[in-house]
Regions:
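Secondary-structure transition/capping motifs at alpha-helix termini
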Residues: 68-76, 97-110, 130, 134-139, ...
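Short, solvent-exposed turn/loop segments enriched in Gly/Ser/Thr/Pro and often Arg
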Residues: 34-36, 44-45, 80-91, 144-152, ...
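Feature 926 captures the class I aminoacyl-tRNA synthetase adenylation module centered on the KMSKS loop
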Residues: 202, 400-460, 464, 508-551, ...
Length: 891
């Protein structure tokens, strides 16, 4: 027995109550159950510093749709939640808080700083989780993990030690991306390239004569965008096959200002076609130069401190900021006559994606992951289709990264994060990598060690997320059952940071892929197509949208029209449309439930006798098939649009209207009313099931009132295609019927006929099947077409010659003109319109005949008046034609 719904849908009063019910009933929880097929998604763990933004809302809505869909299909669906410790982001937040208290991080000390960090995590870390719950996310919150919890810490240590033993992790002096503000190295994936206006400084170095003196007539000229790095130059390079410089092989040049003699080296790295074909080589501050330096055994001279000021190797420039030094060096070169010219140049500059500071390539002792072997199975998995990327075009970006891989710098000069499990003997400096502090040095026997102060890149622990959350390194039942996971849903912007690293980590640690499919989504932009950012002030808070319109409206807005990998624009108007759709579903459901309340509804004895019922059942059945296919192909936006169109157009605007006559005349034909109400209820149930993954709250609230005997819509079975609900003939009849009703409505609208004025509708059709169907729908047609009769016949017998006709497929519809309009009233209306137009034409002619107006008014204003006059004259011609026609009929 269904219950009556409230008059209006109020999401604020419903969503929290329903979500708590789902939690209390443990509907989100998954346990190992070998009688069911598992379906697993791991959440991209949001940062504990984070607050829900539109990107999170889209990402998690997509995941929730998939997990709810699979849960309803009978899968043992696990959505594994958790949060990320976010090393740099969190440390920056804590440092800011300490500054507000007048406390310096280093004065506080590492131990106290970490205490504050854990306090911060406790206070703010759960904020984004509670916000995800507001969205309706059906994660298994009993399994919530944190990338620095005990289990994850154990997994990270295990991986580091194992990979070090296998030679994949090493420590060495290599070029790293150094952030002088955050005072840490960052990975290539964390470098964001920004187009900046700069310069090419063309500089010349004197050649050295055979007697050891610098030439005053021979120079080598090159161009650089970073003249300050010349302080660390240890060579200049030319291409070995460049005939212009063959005579310089083995020669040297003088490095000005520093007065260091450096060699000319021949290296194929040099592009002969670019500039002069000469390149300065600074191994300490350029990754390509570093490689050249290794090939030619060049010294590495670092000229920068960690804060990007010049160090002691910079001589008299020591202590200067890098940009101050640049200016001073250029001025001195100019005074020396060694600055050839300065050229404007726009180029891409590497910046830290967190703080937007220009990074400095620097040689540092860091920990690295050797990538050349690790990346091979990750590349092959996508190449052979073992892992599918959606959309497929993402493969190009994926292979571009795998094919140009560099070793991954994983050490960070931070305190918050997984500390590197490497220990240095206090006596001999021996490095021991181990799961815990060694007791005795294997080299000298010392018993005192100091742990490496650095922490690991955040993405090192995140790369293990698909299996560490299931208990790895222990071989748990969860791990055996739920791994590999099925789908990863993520933004295309972290394909390098996270996706690729999870893939190679899965193959290396588990010997298997971490997931079968990666579903990429784009960015949510503002209505102008701009990226949402604090600086533009165009960010939209999802929680405000939820508070005002409800979570379902936000979810519908984010998914409607969304295609994998594509950016989308966010419009408030679309949220309002989504809210209106929720209200439409609510009101339609309320109408149905009010009418079936207290009635014993039974399955129709002969559904075939009701073409309208057969039509909506068949359309619903086709919808089930189509939506299921779309969902299985991850076409969530297409699937939702089909559900939306069916509910709004076919079910609400057509079928409910079709059914009303039988419902309102139940006393005259109880069986017909029963069949209509049974169809309404059963189709609504299926429609709500199809809608549920997208709009879980409104669908659950309606369903729980429609079917109070069932536990929950979210635990009900997903509909399947049913041959007994397939009625192609009824669909054909209904489509013709709809065309007839639309045609009559259009005629009435064009002639301004109010619904209160009824008219006969004649349908001339020779197809007997269609005629029988139209006859069965006769009373509904009378209601829907504002008719006083609906007559089906095979010819035009009895139809007036002046009847208005509408041609539809396989039939012609006629409406007698005299029944549509009252001739006397229409004559009066037309005469009034004729009088009004006469005045408007006179006024317009008066203005256009006025020389002052024509000569002094703006040209656009004059043209506007001419256009008006032309329109009035056309309208007058039509009015006169109608008047003449009516006079002829009345005579």
């Amino acid at each position: 027995m269904s219950k009556e719904l409230a008059k209006t849908y109020d999401p604020s009063g419903i969503e929290d109550r329903l979500y708590q019910k789902w939690l209390d009933k443990k509907y989100f929880h998954a346990e190992v159950d070998h009688s069911k097929t598992p379906f697993t998604i791991v959440i991209p763990p949001p940062n504990i510093t984070g607050q829900l933004h539109m990107g999170h809302a889209l990402d998690n809505t997509m995941q929730d749709i998939l997990i709810r869909y699979k849960r309803m299909q009978g899968y043992n669906a696990l959505w594994q939640p958790g949060t990320d410790h976010a090393s740099i982001a969190t440390e920056v937040k804590i440092i800011q808080k300490l500054k507000e208290e007048g406390i310096d991080k280093h004065d506080l000390g590492r131990e106290k700083f970490l205490e504050r960090a854990w306090e911060w995590k406790k206070e703010y870390g759960g904020r984004i989780i509670s916000q995800l719950k507001k969205l309706g996310s059906s994660c298994d919150w009993d399994r919530e993990r944190f990338t620095m919890d005990e289990g994850c810490n154990k997994a990270v240590t295990e991986v580091f030690v194992k990979m070090h033993e296998k030679g994949y992790i090493y420590k060495g002096a290599r070029i790293v991306n150094w952030c002088p503000v955050c005072n840490t190295s960052i990975s290539d994936a964390e470098v964001e390239y920004q187009e900046q206006a700069g310069h090419f400084w063309h500089i010349k170095y004197p050649l050295m004569n055979e007697d050891g003196t610098p030439s005053t007539t021979e120079f080598l000229t090159f161009a650089t965008t970073r003249p300050e790095t010349m302080l660390g130059d240890t060579a200049v390079a030319i291409h070995p096959d460049d005939e212009r410089y063959t005579h310089l092989h083995g020669r040297k040049v003088l490095l000005p200002i520093v007065n260091r003699v450096i060699p000319i080296v021949e290296d194929a790295y040099v592009d002969r076609e670019f500039g002069t074909g000469v390149v300065k080589i600074t191994p300490a501050h350029d990754p390509n130069d570093f490689e050249v330096g290794k090939r030619h055994d060049l010294p590495v001279i670092n000229i920068l401190n960690d804060d990007a000021t010049i160090n002691k190797n910079g001589g008299k420039f020591e202590g200067m900021d890098r940009y101050e030094a640049r200016k001073a060096i250029v001025e001195e070169l100019d005074q020396m006559g060694l600055l050839v010219k300065i050229e404007d140049h726009v180029h891409n500059v590497g910046t830290h994606d967190r703080c937007k500071t220009t990074i400095e390539p620097m040689v540092k002792d860091q920990w690295f992951v050797k990538m050349d072997e690790l990346i091979k199975p990750a590349r092959e998995a996508v190449k052979n289709g073992e892992i599918k990327l959606i959309p497929e075009r993402m493969e190009k970006n994926y292979f571009n990264w795998t094919d140009n891989i560099r070793d991954w710098c994983i050490s960070r000069q931070l305190w918050w994060g997984h500390r590197i499990p490497a220990y240095y003997c206090d006596d001999c400096g021996e490095v021991v990598v181990a799961k815990e502090m060694p007791k005795v040095c294997p080299k000298c026997g010392c018993t005192h060690f100091t742990q490496d102060p650095d922490t690991l890149d955040t993405w090192f622990s995140s790369a293990l997320w698909p299996f560490e959350t299931l208990g790895w390194p222990e071989q748990t039942e969860d791990l055996k059952y739920f791994y590999p996971t099925d789908v990863l849903v993520t933004g295309y912007d972290i394909i390098f940071f996270w996706v690729i690293r999870m893939i190679f980590s899965g193959y290396e640690q588990m010997g298997e892929k971490p997931f079968k499919t990666v579903l990429f989504h784009g960015l949510v932009r503002d209505s102008q197509g701009r990226k949402m950012s604090k600086s533009l002030g165009n960010g939209i808070d999802p929680l405000e949208i939820i508070s005002q319109y409800g979570a379902d409206a936000l979810r519908l807005t984010l998914i409607t029209g969304n295609a994998p990998g594509n950016d989308m624009r966010f419009y408030y108007e679309r949220v309002e449309n989504s809210r209106n759709f929720a209200n439409k579903v609510w009101n339609a459901s309320r109408f149905i439930m009010m009418n079936i309340e207290g009635r014993e509804i039974t399955e129709p004895k002969d559904v075939n006798a009701r073409p309208g019922d057969c039509w909506i059942m068949s359309r619903c059945n086709n919808l089930v098939k189509d939506v299921t296919e779309n969902m299985d192909k991850f076409e969530l936006g297409i699937a939702l649009q089909k559900v939306y169109d069916f509910i709004w157009d076919e079910f609400c605007d057509w079928y409910i209207e079709l059914a009303k006559y039988r419902i309102y005349h139940a006393e005259e034909d109880a069986e017909a009313a029963n069949d209509a109400m049974w169809t309404l209820r059963e189709v609504l149930k299926k429609a709500l099931k199809l809608l549920h993954p997208f709009m879980p709250f409104v669908s659950e609230e309606i369903y729980s009132n429609l079917c109070p005997e069932e536990a929950s819509l979210m635990m009900s079975e997903w509909p399947v295609y049913d041959e007994s609900w397939s009625f192609p003939e009824a669909e054909n009849i209904a489509e013709h019927f709809k065309a007839i009703v639309k045609g009559v409505r259009n005629v009435r609208a064009e002639m301004n006929v109010p619904n209160s004025r009824k008219a006969k509708v004649y349908v001339v059709c020779e197809d007997q099947t269609l005629c029988a169907g139209f006859e069965a729908l006769k009373q509904s047609a009378i209601m829907m077409a504002a008719a006083n009769d609906f007559l089906i016949q095979q010819d035009k017998t009895g139809i007036a010659d002046d009847a208005v006709s509408v041609v539809v497929p396989d039939a012609t519809v006629y409406v007698p003109l005299e029944e549509l309009i009252d001739f006397e009233q229409e004559m009066e209306r037309l005469r009034k319109e004729e009088s009004r137009l006469t005045k408007e034409i006179a006024r317009s002619n008066g203005m256009l005949n006025n020389e002052k107006f024509v000569s002094k008014a703006p040209a656009a204003k004059v043209q506007e008046e001419k256009d008006k006059l032309e329109k009035y004259q056309q309208m007058m011609d039509q009015v006169k034609e109608r008047l003449e026609g009516l006079k002829a009929k009345m005579s």
